[in-house]
């Protein structure tokens, strides 16, 4: 289903180094050899992403509800430097790196998608919707490149970057509901909608819908992440997280329906006033080498899972605030997650000061356990 073909002409931005701004002190070490990144925004961090390159000195970017997007450089196992920051006049809902890490796309609540050129430190509007832009993903195809944005205006739009500063829309897909979450692992794209349906697209010849899958989850979808097949070569399916403390594992082309399943997570171990406390799954990431996954929740914990063995690998101790978003570095060595208020208890529940960013060494924690004979 997911091979290769053409769609437009490939356009290259080219690569350049980031211009260095003020440097923050070295990160502070926390328990279990985790590392606290200095200079986190005050407001809730909505999205956090490692850069694709370079492997030895990756960068880290986060977008916040206060409209700030920040970039750090990872120098060694204990030291992070703040490199750059931009202030956007709207909450930031998503970000996406370009493949050479020279630029970042920004999805904003003011109905605009922006591009931040790190070398020139300039920000330009590259796409516009009729509602808040909830998701953005850079598609680096075999024969074309473009930005994919999903919005509360019930559309998925694709933008050509060759004619900047002019906005050039390559395609638009009308959807039955608002976009709540999306992911891209070329040539697959998945888009989770407010009606709990997931649209699956093949991107090889331009965006072509190949499936409409109804979620196994009964409650609102919060996050979605694509996983590869067991050979770790091609995209095979996706995992969904919901506000009900549950994850669904769904294959796109499933030989055995029993391969699709759900599991409970991010719930209190003890009953509270006779009831179990249930927390939202705020983000999901797959390990690039092991194929295992990490979930983070409003309970302030992260948990690591082996979906093939259907076992839990690890659950963290509780943090004092919800975990709002996460990412795993392409080397598989590091998990980054953000702490902050996730608004699950409304305005009156916002008593937690500021946000925090933590780096966790995860390559051993996320390694599948040997099967018992």
UniProtKB/Swiss-Prot annotation:
Tissues with expression: Expressed along the ventral and dorsal nerve cords.
Modified residues (N-acetylmethionine): 1
Gene Ontology biological process terms from the UniProt entry: mRNA transport; protein transport; RNA export from nucleus; transcription-dependent tethering of RNA polymerase II gene DNA at nuclear periphery
WD repeats: 40-82, 87-126, 128-169, 276-315
InterPro entries tied to this protein: G-protein_beta_WD-40_rep, WD40/YVTN_repeat-like_dom_sf, WD40_repeat_CS, WD40_repeat_dom_sf, WD40_rpt
GO molecular function: RNA binding; ubiquitin binding
Superkingdom in the source lineage: Eukaryota
Cellular component annotations (GO), alphabetically ordered: axon; nuclear pore; synapse
Keywords, sorted A to Z: Acetylation, Cell projection, mRNA transport, Nuclear pore complex, Nucleus, Protein transport, Repeat, Synapse, Translocation, Transport, WD repeat
Compartment list: Nucleus, Nuclear pore complex; Nucleus; Cell projection, Axon; Synapse
Statement: the UniProt record of this protein carries the keyword DNA damage: no
Transport keyword on record: yes
Residues that span the membrane, as ranges: none
Family statement: Belongs to the WD repeat rae1 family.
Quaternary structure and partners: The nuclear pore complex (NPC) constitutes the exclusive means of nucleocytoplasmic transport. NPCs allow the passive diffusion of ions and small molecules and the active, nuclear transport receptor-mediated bidirectional transport of macromolecules such as proteins, RNAs, ribonucleoparticles (RNPs), and ribosomal subunits across the nuclear envelope. Interacts with rpm-1.
Function, in words: Functions as a component of the nuclear pore complex (NPC). NPC components, collectively referred to as nucleoporins (NUPs), can play the role of both NPC structural components and of docking or interaction partners for transiently associated nuclear transport factors. It is specifically important for nuclear mRNA export. Has a role in neuronal development, where it acts downstream of rpm-1 to control axon termination and synapse formation in anterior lateral microtubule (ALM) and posterior lateral microtubule (PLM) mechanosensory neurons.
Name this polypeptide is given: mRNA export factor rae-1
Organism: Caenorhabditis elegans
